[in-house]
Design a protein with these regions (language model features):
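N-terminal secretory signal peptides and thylakoid transit peptides that target proteins
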Residues: 1-19
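Extended terminal and domain-junction accessory segments
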Residues: 24, 29-42, 144-177, 245-374, ...
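N-terminal edge beta-strand
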Residues: 53-71, 194-204, 337-359
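Extracytoplasmic beta-sandwich strand-turn segments characteristic of Greek-key/jelly-roll folds
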Residues: 65, 70, 96-128, 200-201, ...
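Short tyrosine-centred short linear motifs in exposed loops/low-complexity segments
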Residues: 75-76, 118, 126-132, 210-211, ...
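Asparagine-centered strand-capping/turn motif at beta-strand->loop junctions
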Residues: 82-86, 218-219, 367-371
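Hydrophobic or amphipathic alpha-helical targeting/insertion segments
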Residues: 126-156
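Acidic-aromatic/histidine active-site loop/patch
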Residues: 166-209, 218-221, 342
Length: 443
């Protein structure tokens, strides 16, 4: 694969890790397990900290953290049941899938939560191919449930997946543990423990020179934004937040992942190992390898340059900015630990919508961060283009998770084509509970 062109990634900007992994080898497409038909959310134990620490009491789907991989092809119906065996209400949400509002799984906004001991049947057909996460969105219980391990990956395959030799699916998360290996109940932005499932990081693969690799990477952390550094190859980013993008190389081989972000990368093995590592510039610490692809085996013939994933035909090719409805949301600090949107500290989905538009209307939205910390915001039910500073163009990818640096403004544009009540809120449950809990109406 030739060295890919570099773009000005101004919109990617800034943005204890556990990595759990699924992998397939193959030609035109990965092996396709049957979609999970039942998920039970319940207490579980998993060894996170090294001995002599005891296994950590977690919350899990089907007893595993992350939960089971759900995999299906675009156009295939997903039918599953969720059993709540927790001590608090929960839901099952699929952010990024652009499904109908009534199926979004957002307690208090789109549905009632599933009470302890209850069950729910979930049926939908994802409209888009892509890589996303499933997780709870259960109001005040969300922060604890997500931080304790309730998350898992869902892959909706393209009708004709690109030919690769190895596909790896990695879900990252960080953990806040005390000295005995028990979960701490705090909202620190980063956990102290760095693990890879039940084993020490990094997760390791082996592939021969010339092998084409597709890596699907997600950040399931409840609070932590991560900077990922790549060594040994210049990969192509081919999808962001569940939607295909024009292929591009990450600037300086770094890319930021806010909580909930998903990236897909394609690269061809050379004659040395490839490492994806966690970079912590604030701590001046060495990069922490998370995923390593060792070079091993007989070389494979060179492949043609990767042309990218098929564009999503359901997304607009253009957004008419001239007739767009324009809105601004200012994120600010309130009293104590409170946060506010446009001067109002919002409880879960309270009050009036931040804005309301007709179905099909183009929208531009300015997210103005007047706080002293970066804020990660999520757009519900839709994906948006990141606009250039003068609204004179946009980046060649779609996003639903946006890192807004302190004292900066991020502008986005989208077509409001999914009816219902949707969040425009923090992707960090603790910040959402502190007041960054807005919503908008599409009718």
């Amino acid at each position: 694969m030739r060295a890919p062109p570099r773009f000005d990634r101004r919109a990617l900007l800034l943005g204890g890790v556990a990595a759990s992994l699924w992998a397939w080898r193959g030609g035109a497409g990965a092996a396709t397990p049957a979609p999970a038909r039942r998920l039970t959310a319940a207490a579980a134990s998993q060894a996170l900290a090294p001995p002599p620490a005891a296994p950590t009491r977690l919350l899990a789907y089907e007893g595993t953290v992350p939960g089971p991989l759900i995999r299906l092809r675009r156009g295939e119906a997903l039918a599953l049941s969720l059993a709540n065996r927790l001590d608090a209400p929960t839901t099952l949400s699929f952010p990024g899938l652009r499904i109908a509002n009534a199926l979004a799984g957002i307690a208090g906004l789109t549905q009632a939560p599933i009470e302890p001991g209850g069950e729910a049947e979930i049926r939908f057909t994802p409209p888009d191919a892509g890589f996303n996460l499933y997780l709870p969105d259960a109001g005040a219980a969300t922060a604890r449930q997500l931080a304790a391990g309730l998350f898992g990956p869902i892959v909706v395959e393209e009708p004709s997946p690109p030919a690769v030799d190895l596909e790896a699916i990695v879900v990252l998360a960080d953990w806040r543990l005390d000295e005995a290996g028990r979960l701490r109940d705090d909202s620190a932005p980063a956990g102290a423990l760095v693990t890879a499932g039940a084993a020490a990081a990094p997760q390791r693969f082996a592939a021969p020179p010339g092998a084409r690799v597709r890596l699907r990477l997600a950040n399931a952390s409840a609070t932590r934004a991560m900077t990922i550094a790549v060594d040994g190859v210049t990969p192509l980013i081919v999808a962001v937040d569940g939607q295909p993008s024009a292929p591009f190389a990450p600037l300086r081989n770094l890319f930021p992942m806010g909580p909930g972000a998903r990236f897909e990368l394609v690269f061809d093995m050379a004659d040395a190992a490839v490492a994806f590592s966690l970079r912590d510039d604030a701590a001046s610490a060495p990069d922490q390898p998370l995923v390593v692809f060792a070079c091993d085996g007989a070389a494979k013939p060179a492949r043609p340059e990767f042309a990218g994933l098929p564009a999503n035909p359901l997304l607009p090719k253009e957004i008419d900015l001239a007739r767009a409805r324009r809105f601004e949301l200012t994120l600010s600090s309130g009293d104590g630990a409170a946060l506010a949107i446009n001067g109002e500290t919002l409880s879960e989905w309270s009050g009036k919508p931040q804005f309301a538009v007709r179905r099909g209307a183009p929208v531009t939205l300015a997210l103005i961060n007047a706080t002293a910390a970066a804020q990660t915001m999520r757009l519900g039910g839709h994906v948006a283009r990141l606009l250039h500073a003068l609204d004179d163009g946009w980046e060649p990818y779609w996003r639903d998770v946006f890192i807004v640096p302190p004292s900066r403004t991020v502008r986005l544009a989208f077509v409001a084509d999914n009816p219902g009540k949707w969040p425009i809120a923090s992707a960090t449950p603790a910040s959402r509970a502190a007041g960054l809990s807005g919503w908008f109406q599409v009718g």
